[in-house]
């Protein structure tokens, strides 16, 4: 195995969860500017597309990263071990420091095809995929859920994954059936930690689900002795979720992050064409808690270009400044 970066991380370490159409190079750099986590994962990249002669072009943007983001982990999904083997070798050549295997995606057209969380129902295939992914020499980690249908599945499933000799296991504390409709099952953390200690004490344990910020993560780590904390949806409510010394942030700071997001989108669009509409999901992160926020979000959602969005921000901030001077 190449250098196992996981062993060099602080305890507890913090990870920005991989999220489809979210954790691309643009948003990762915005989060870095606000408050950087210890580890970044890419958005989801499909092994079949990567291994297809034509498909590689469709996933190229998903695997784009810069040196200042290291350690960078490629988050990949599929169900054919030979494709994971091929991709693991390619990812090592690209400079990634690790590979994370998606065994938790609950989306129907993924799970019902035996991929993502569907692999919970295919434990032998999951094991083959994990072993095949070690071919490139990078440390292999897994992100999964407690089970597919029922919480009671967690012990047999997680025991099986722990037995595969992986670097890190990130557990979203819900089942596939639960999606994100119920509270994460924090009450199981202690038992999961005990199982890890018995089966695979050298595998790091990362917890995910309903963790809004670094402070909450530290409390969980101190209480249960887990190694890592993964924050996902919490970043939508607070882009400063990873900051070590939390403080109040002004609307100017939030709008400044939006301007940075626009600039980075423009910068990386030159390397890999990106649809402007993909920006719209991010506006609510930055435009909040200020007079006129709802109207500004509505206007931004109707923009068609970076220039239009910037013009709206210029006008809005000019009005803000004028009101503050009165």
UniProtKB/Swiss-Prot annotation:
The active site annotation covers: 105 (proton donor)
UniProt keyword list: Flavoprotein, FMN, NADP, Oxidoreductase, RNA-binding, tRNA processing, tRNA-binding
Q: Which cysteines are joined by disulfide bonds?
A: none
Binding positions for FMN per the UniProt entry: 18-20, 143, 208-210, 232-233
Query: EC number(s) of the enzyme?
Result: 1.3.1.-
Q: Which InterPro entries match?
A: Aldolase_TIM, DUS-like_FMN-bd, DUS_fam, tRNA-dHydroUridine_Synthase_C, tRNA_hU_synthase_CS
Flavoprotein keyword on record: yes
Q: Which reaction does it catalyse?
A: a 5,6-dihydrouridine in tRNA + NAD(+) = a uridine in tRNA + NADH + H(+); a 5,6-dihydrouridine in tRNA + NADP(+) = a uridine in tRNA + NADPH + H(+)
Q: What superkingdom heads the lineage?
A: Bacteria
Any idea which GO molecular function terms this record carries?
flavin adenine dinucleotide binding; tRNA binding; tRNA dihydrouridine synthase activity
Q: Which cofactor does it need?
A: FMN
Q: What does this protein do?
A: Catalyzes the synthesis of 5,6-dihydrouridine (D), a modified base found in the D-loop of most tRNAs, via the reduction of the C5-C6 double bond in target uridines.
The family annotation for this protein states: Belongs to the Dus family.
- Protein name as annotated: Probable tRNA-dihydrouridine synthase
């Amino acid at each position: 195995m190449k250098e196992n970066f996981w062993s060099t991380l602080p305890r507890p370490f913090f990870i920005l969860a991989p999220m489809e159409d979210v954790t691309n190079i643009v948003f990762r750099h915005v989060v870095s500017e606000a408050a950087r986590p210890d580890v970044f994962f890419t958005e989801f990249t499909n092994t079949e597309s990567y291994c297809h002669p034509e498909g590689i072009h469709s996933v190229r943007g998903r695997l784009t990263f810069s040196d200042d983001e290291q350690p960078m982990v490629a988050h990949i999904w599929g169900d054919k071990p030979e494709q994971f083997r091929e991709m693991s070798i390619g990812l090592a050549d690209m400079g990634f420091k690790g590979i994370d295997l998606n065994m938790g995606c609950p989306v129907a057209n993924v799970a019902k095809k035996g991929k993502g969380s569907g692999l919970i129902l295919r434990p032998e295939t999951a094991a083959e995929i994990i072993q095949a992914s070690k071919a490139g020499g990078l440390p292999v980690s897994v992100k999964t859920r407690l089970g597919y249908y029922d919480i009671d599945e967690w012990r047999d499933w997680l025991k099986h994954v722990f037995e595969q000799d992986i670097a890190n296991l990130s557990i979203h504390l819900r089942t596939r059936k639960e999606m994100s409709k119920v509270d994460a099952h924090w009450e199981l953390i202690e038992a999961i930690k005990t199982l890890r200690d018995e089966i695979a004490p050298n595998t790091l344990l990362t917890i995910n689900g309903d963790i809004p910020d670094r402070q909450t993560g530290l409390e969980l780590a101190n209480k249960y002795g887990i190694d890592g904390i993964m924050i996902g949806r919490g970043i939508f409510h607070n882009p400063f979720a990873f900051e070590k010394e939390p403080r109040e942030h002004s609307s100017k700071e939030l709008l400044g992050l939006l301007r940075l997001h626009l600039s980075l989108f423009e910068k990386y669009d030159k390397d890999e064409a990106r649809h402007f509409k993909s920006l719209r999901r991010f506006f609510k992160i930055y435009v909040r808690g200020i007079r006129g926020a709802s109207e500004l979000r509505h206007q931004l959602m109707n923009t068609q270009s970076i220039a239009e969005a910037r013009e709206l921000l210029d006008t809005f901030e000019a009005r803000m400044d004028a009101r503050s001077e009165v």
